[in-house]
Amino acid sequence: MDEFHRYGKEDNSRQQCFLYPLFFQEDLYAISHDHYLDGSSSSEPMEHLSSNDQFSFLTVKRLIGQIRQQNHSIVLFVNCAPNPLADCKKSSYSESVLEGLTLVLEVPFSIRSKYSVEGMNEWKSFRSIHSIFPFLEDKFPHSNYISDARIPYSIHPEILVRTFRRLIRDAPSLHPLRSVLYEYRNSPENLQRSIIVVPRVNTRFFLFLWNYYVYECESILFSLLKRSSHSRSVAHRPFPQRTHFHRKIKHIIIFSRRNSLKSIWLLKDPKINYVRYGERSIIAIKGTHLLVKKCRYYLLLFRQCYFHLWSEPYRVCSHQLSKNCSSSPGYFLRVRMNPLFVRTKMLDELFIADLITNEFDPIVPIVPILGLLAREKFCDVSGRPISKLSWTNLTDDDILNRFDQIWRNLFHYYSGSFGRDGLYRIKYILSLSCAKTLACKHKSTIRVVRKELGPELFQKSFSKEREFDSLPFSSKAAARSQRERIWHSDIPQINPLVNSWQKIQDLKIENLFDQ
């Protein structure tokens, strides 16, 4: 792989990343085949791999020769298999060639990212979900407006190719990418006739498309936000000298006082903070309502002009934090006023001052979680636990482990929220639903199941003090656990209930705009 990077660097100095000859290198497909085997071995056992999936580099050489002859055999990237006995969708040939295409396209972006990271001191880029919660606690209390924006994930394949063309000047190297995208677009499984760039399938190709697409969206957006933070009077044009900037602001303030006092606040530098998780992004702004409306307008206009996408208005929602709650990522997020009483002593005199601070307050969405539990057949609409009939064919340990995993995911994910008392209602529903599922499996009652299996099985999974076993709490500190927030380190394993609840919230917002 280092040789490909060196080859890309040499071509970058001569012909702006001339990558087309890399497609005919046999070593490239050997590397991609190893990556394909590593990915398949981690997802499925070796005994599931049939003998028909044997890989032959002689066949790859023949395919390379056919590509050189340009007899339209490029369609093998998606749905063609040289071995008729092998499954078309799981063919190692198509996957390996697709991996090779991804490796070639990653060469210029890896070189570009090496030099772009050096200039990212002003905009700190975090790549972990753990950075979201410090961001919310640090930036949300100092913001008064929030914009919840969703990245459009359905895009025309030709737009993706044009965005690649801005970096890769080698036009022939983009022909295989265009063929793959159009082949996927015209496949019978794709009913929307567009490219879904969200990596629903964990393949290297779709992950690369998603990362590149998000990078293009955020890189241009960051430059607009940086320019807009210098001045609101000149759109996206920073002042060359700071002295002229202060003089112009002073002149505008004197002029605006004759008309309206509210226009003075439009000239102050706004504080704009940005965070993204998945396809949802949050822009926290400290400014006026007119500034938030302009940011929302610029964001919609940016997507339409840069990516030629019509972005629905409900994809960018703006509201005030002190009056409304946001619903991302899986929380009810709000900022509340917290009066703080501080006493200071100076010169033997006691001065008492009341300080009012803003406090970030994530709320556990108990009612939506109950609705999702009813949707997944753990309880009815009123919250009464019922048996999970689809799990009755599992063993007792599997049933207990599944219920236990759901509870641990819920508790750990909402461990940093205030008012976690409602979670114990969820715990009661899950424990009783687990007991009813075991009773339904053994065709007995809950009392008989407890006598036969013993209460220790339930205590193993639903113990009262289990959630505090791993926390460094003393006996006195345990009483203050409801007022303290601890974000667990295993929250990246987000439970599917949170994602399902977020989809329901999106549908509600869409219905409001459709009316």
Curated annotation (Swiss-Prot):
Keyword DNA repair: no
InterPro entries: Domain_X, Maturase_MatK, Maturase_MatK_N
A GO term from the CC aspect: chloroplast
Compartments, record wording: Plastid, Chloroplast
GO MF entry, a single one: RNA binding
Keywords: Chloroplast, mRNA processing, Plastid, RNA-binding, tRNA processing
Source organism, top-level taxon: Eukaryota
GO biological process, one term: mRNA processing
Family of this protein: Belongs to the intron maturase 2 family. MatK subfamily.
Function according to Swiss-Prot or TrEMBL: Usually encoded in the trnK tRNA gene intron. Probably assists in splicing its own and other chloroplast group II introns.
Name of this chain's protein: Maturase K
Organism whose genome encodes this protein: Pinus pumila
